[in-house]
Amino acid sequence: MFSTRTALTSLRPSLAAARRPQRHIPRRTFVSSTIHNLSEGFLDLAIALPWPPEWPPYSCTIILVTVVTRLAFTVPFSVWAKNRQWRAENIVVPQLKQEMPSIHKQVQQDMKRDGFRGDKEAVIAEINKRSRVVAKERRSELLKQNNCSPMPTIAMPIITQLPLFVGTSMVFAEAARAPTVLDSEAFFTLTSLSHADSTLTLPIMLGIITLANVESSKWFVSAEVLKREQEVAKWTAERRARGEQVLQPSKIYQTALRILSVGRILIAAMVPGTVQLYWVTSATFGLFQSWTLDYWDMRRRQRHAISEKQKDSA
């Protein structure tokens, strides 16, 4: 009797070890230890959650963790940035446009006081040159007054999202490191969560979703923004016709994102299935987030335009 109980007791650690293979960490640092502990916590969470028996628990937990972390850590900053962008486009730009006649008038007075001489074309060129300098300074003042400077608006979402994205990718990659229980779970075209998708379906989906996010950014653009872009394009063409070199940051940014869409396919093809699933889920969430925020912004612009017309008519 005692020997039987002893034998059963000795089997329990081996059964636990079979359920959770022990992985050797060559060199423990604070980062590697934290990543390892988080990956173990993820595996425990997947088993603890009450998923239906027919659902793959680890894959569903990856999707759930992705959605929850995006909702908690990225959506608030994206809304914050969208509000700042809205103030810049609907408060700063109209006010600056309203002040441009007075800026031109002040520049002409300054030129008369300075005794500027030249033909008509030279005078117009000088007025435009000085007006651009004054308008740029005034724009910076208005952006600061309305708390919508472009640099924090662009940088804050990147600063908050990038560490989360990299850290979560490292956690899921660590969870897929052999030996792991993820070997036995398949999902979609993944024969195993610990191996890359041999069909390249998920990496290609990732590239398509990323490209769709880039190209769909113009779907909800207002008529004022389109008109302003056309004016900028015309102004750029005129400057290039005169032999000037003009850089367009927005087009450079769009081109870089398109290249990134292709690059993500190549990178995603080399990472484990857990990371591929996380990246595709995160990109899909980001696409719907962009659509939702852009639609919300479009509706807000429409309401703002209606209220402005009502004020003018009153």
Predicted regions and their residues:
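Hydrophobic alpha-helical transmembrane segments of multi-pass integral membrane proteins
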Residues: 60-69, 131, 135, 150-174, ...
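Membrane-water interface at transmembrane helix exits
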Residues: 81-82, 169, 173, 177, ...
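N-terminal mitochondrial targeting presequence
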Residues: 1-39, 314
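Membrane-interface amphipathic helices and adjacent TM-edge segments
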Residues: 73-161, 226-261
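Interfacial loop/helix-cap signal at membrane boundaries in integral membrane proteins
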Residues: 29-61, 182-197
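Transmembrane alpha-helical insertion/packing segments
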Residues: 13-14, 29, 33-37, 58, ...
